[in-house]
Amino acid sequence: MDMQERYNRRENIRNFSIIAHIDHGKSTLADRILENTKSVETREMQDQLLDSMDLERERGITIKLNAVRLKYEANDGQTYTFHLIDTPGHVDFSYEVSRSLAACEGAILVVDAAQGIEAQTLANVYLALDNDLELLPVVNKIDLPAAEPERVKQELEDVIGLNQDDVVLASAKSNIGIEDILEKIVEVVPPPEGDPSEPLKALIFDSEYDPYRGVISSIRVMEGVVKAGDKIKMMATGKEFEVSEVGINTPKQLPIEELTVGDVGYIIASIKNVDDSRVGDTITHANRPAEAPLKGYKKMNPMVYCGLFPIENKDYNDLREALEKLQLNDASLEFEPESSQALGFGFRTGFLGMLHMEIIQERIEREFGIELIATAPSVIYQCIMKDGSEVTVDNPAQMPERDKIDSIYEPYVKATMMVPNDYVGAVMELCQRKRGQFINMDYLDDIRVNIVYEIPLSEVVFDFFDQLKSNTKGYASFDYEFIENKESNLVKMDILLNGDKVDALSFIVHKDFAYERGKALVEKLKTLIPRQQFEVPVQAAIGQKIVARTNIKSMGKNVLSKCYGGDISRKRKLLEKQKAGKAKMKAVGSVEIPQDAFLAVLKMDDE
């Protein structure tokens, strides 16, 4: 197509994503939009069409972002090209949201007519506003018996500052209001800016690995044009490739002639190495490069680290490959090799949060068939040593000796919780117990309160969310963001089995809670570790000092069962022999530790 056609086409493109709190009906709305624009034939339609991963369907959540092109004939007689980018709603996947927003000009904000605005809704709205997106508010599920659309409209105006008249009332499940939403998209979302005659600039916002075609990158073209046969260059790495195919997702991949300004599609350029197509990088032409790369979105740093070890040592290299492939379209996953005396060779892996960690572990076990043992997660600590140097610790087993450390800093997060009035006391008590500092509290209306605390991340990552939910009967919503590292009085707790340190069970704890945590853990391990032929002491120690101890009793074997009556010295001889055997076994014997024991470190607060 010539330049003029490209300019004309640009005016009719609308790029938008759908943002919402988890479970407010985002993926269902995406399904209806696909259906009403006749992008998918009825026989291929299935619920949560864009959630292509099995895990996403099982858990009913969106994990990966997805982009798809639709055609829409509007009431003004023109045909518009929509690019819909579906995003996850869970706090751990907010980087997926920020990625897809970087490729859009507008966002549909979906709010549940019964639940109203939740913590995650606000977090996503702020992300959208940071990216200068136009917001189109939709109140969804208006056909629910508990729906209060008018109250929610008022909330949108009071809390976010959106005009009530712009709100569309809809029910994605019953197909109500979908036409209004499509018309509103044409009206509210601005067409993309950018010049097709300028040098190429395209943002990579996702990529996946195909064993036959190499890396497939999802891109949004900001300036210029790209087509098959072009020589392209990655601006971050400087590597050059030849494009073999460009195309669009309709949700299936469909090759087309070219991608121009405003287009969202995919590009294949026989890129074999996963590292060469990094999410957030800018693609340009090798012979006519752009002057500066696009500003990618901010790199998300992992918040939580844990060790992943294959149960079979021979799977070590397969695990490395699995992590590399997952890292390709999950920019926030980090890993490096580590070895543990208890578990052998594995990887220290960084995640954004606990759900992210669970999903990655499950994907490795499912998609790559590798059985894993995971150690208890920990956060990153900064240690200032007495000689003035700084040490970063993401693995409790590597914490330097306490007498060499001057001070320890741990990450704090700002936790925002939306809670019904009746549960404010319970939530504040939970935050105090987790060493939180109260910041402020706003009453949104008669029923809900927004509470803000500063809490150490180490207290949040384990089971804070579960406890928050159980303390509020499931009504609270929660969002957190990192603020800074603060000095804390922390100590490293070692666990000794049979007198040997088990490095994978070490954890870092605040000194005030050390005794009770240590006591709770040894008691818990006593129930989890199977009994041996000999008695096994389980001890919790800080440095050289033992703070708690218990014994796992030995299994008794009656060696006297064959002695009928007879001489006492005969019995004594057998008992002495057994005793000597047990002593020898105890000196040499190792204790098998089941996977549950490694996770026991997490679950100590439940008792």
UniProtKB/Swiss-Prot annotation:
It is a peripheral membrane protein. Gene3D superfamilies: 3.30.70.240, Elongation factor 4, C-terminal domain, Elongation Factor G (Translational Gtpase), domain 3, P-loop containing nucleotide triphosphate hydrolases, Translation factors. InterPro entries: EF-4, EFG_II, EFG_III/V, EFG_V-like, EFTu-like_2, G_TR_CS, LepA_C_sf, LepA_CTD. Residues 11-193 form the tr-type G domain. It is found in: Cell membrane. GO terms for molecular function: GTP binding; GTPase activity; ribosome binding; translation elongation factor activity. It catalyses: GTP + H2O = GDP + phosphate + H(+). GO terms for biological process: positive regulation of translation. Its main location: membrane. SMART domains: EFG_C. Keywords: Cell membrane, GTP-binding, Hydrolase, Membrane, Nucleotide-binding, Protein biosynthesis. Its EC number is 3.6.5.n1. GTP binds at D23, H24, G25, K26, S27, T28, N140, K141, I142, D143. One of its GO terms (cellular component) is plasma membrane. Belongs to the TRAFAC class translation factor GTPase superfamily. Classic translation factor GTPase family. LepA subfamily. PANTHER family: TRANSLATION FACTOR GUF1 HOMOLOG, CHLOROPLASTIC, TRANSLATION FACTOR GUF1-RELATED. HAMAP family: LepA. Required for accurate and efficient protein synthesis under certain stress conditions. May act as a fidelity factor of the translation reaction, by catalyzing a one-codon backward translocation of tRNAs on improperly translocated ribosomes. Back-translocation proceeds from a post-translocation (POST) complex to a pre-translocation (PRE) complex, thus giving elongation factor G a second chance to translocate the tRNAs correctly. Binds to ribosomes in a GTP-dependent manner. This is Elongation factor 4. The gene is lepA.
